[in-house]
Amino acid sequence: MWNFIKELRRKDHQRYLGGLDSFKYIGPGLLVTVGFIDPGNWASNFAAGADFGYSLLWVITLSTIMLIVLQHNVAHLGIVTGLCLSEAATKYTPKWVSRPILGTAVLASISTSLAEILGGAIALEMLFDIPVIWGSLLTAFFVTIMLFTNSYKRIERSIIAFVSVIGLSFLYELFLVDIDWPLAARSWVTPSIPEGSLLVIMSVLGAVVMPHNLFLHSEVVQSREYNKKDDASIRKLLKYEFYDTLFSMGVGWAINSAMILLAAATFFANHIGVEELQQAKSLLEPLLGNQAATIFALALLMAGISSTVTSGMAAGSIFAGMFGESYHVKDVHSRVGILLSLGIALVVILFIENPFQGLIISQMILSIQLPFTIFLQVGLTSSKRVMGQYANSRWSSFVLYTMAVIVSVLNLALLFSESF
């Protein structure tokens, strides 16, 4: 009987996709989650909470909803075509379209790496008094070695561990503060734009919905040896990928919300402005104790390292895709993309006087590039030439294009407000 059961499980080498086995498909989404609980998010979220209290929590909710839709759509592309977003753009669009967009995506990945490396460096300064410049070099060196010497599976396990540490750290911090939960609940679903908050809103949006994550998700979703032999198998994969995305983005929503809640309950409630993350740690000590401040710094270090890993992977994927290649740690173009992203980010860090403001501006750059990536993605996933029968429906295309338009309008409003 036992042998008969084993034969059934081996038949067609096909995995069972029901029940507890669905947890095997959790993973790619969590790599994306790291990208929007990175140090740039910390800077944006603590600025939002310290300056405007609970009022900008709705931005986290809106951004996360947009993120779920966009990330599932781009993972859809990866599963159906076997191509990442960069490869698909190179294959299916003219060079005059793909090259400028992918070029700006590389710049966005550099901006991302800048924020991630800075976050790790700031955490090292908090914990061990290592200067930011040396901390940046250490973070970049460690991440480069990690990317060049580890398999995807090992990296995925490490990232899941890092996300767990970050989540537990903020859960502990929230137990120490007095949260106005009724006000928080209203703020999660009630849009409010306080005077002077537009830059912070755009920074939060750019910190949650990030262009490099769209490229990354379409790449890492292919890392599993999925069975795609027929339409039923592909549709099951799309369903379970959606569960992975929904769960992972939900984790990210909770952690981002926790940052704003913590800042609102401590800094905003005591009329304390926060100009930099180092200041946030020092201000937490008298309010919540030394242990809470140390846990804050440790979580920031985990966020910095893990998000630098994923931004490096995304840069490698984008750059390799420009040459029609998929990401692989031994591929020359993938390695060049990683080194370009981390190396240029390090050079820029040398000239930054205010690291905290640098984190805010880096998120704004991501938000400005984002519409180009979204329009590219939706154009590809709406094309029957690219996706066949799995192309977006008219309703899905309408929703996705509407998101791109909303982001574009917000960007124009931001640029206008900053210019006048």
Positions of PLM-derived features:
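Hydrophobic transmembrane alpha-helices that form the core helical bundles
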Residues: 76, 98-129, 136-139, 304-323, ...
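Membrane-interface "cap" regions at the ends of multi-pass membrane proteins
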Residues: 1-40, 95-96, 200, 236-240
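Flexible loop linkers connecting adjacent transmembrane helices
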Residues: 5-11, 44-49, 72-97, 122, ...
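Juxtamembrane transmembrane-helix boundary signature
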Residues: 32, 59-91, 100-111
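Loop-to-transmembrane helix boundary motifs in multi-pass membrane proteins
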Residues: 95-98, 133-136, 247, 293, ...
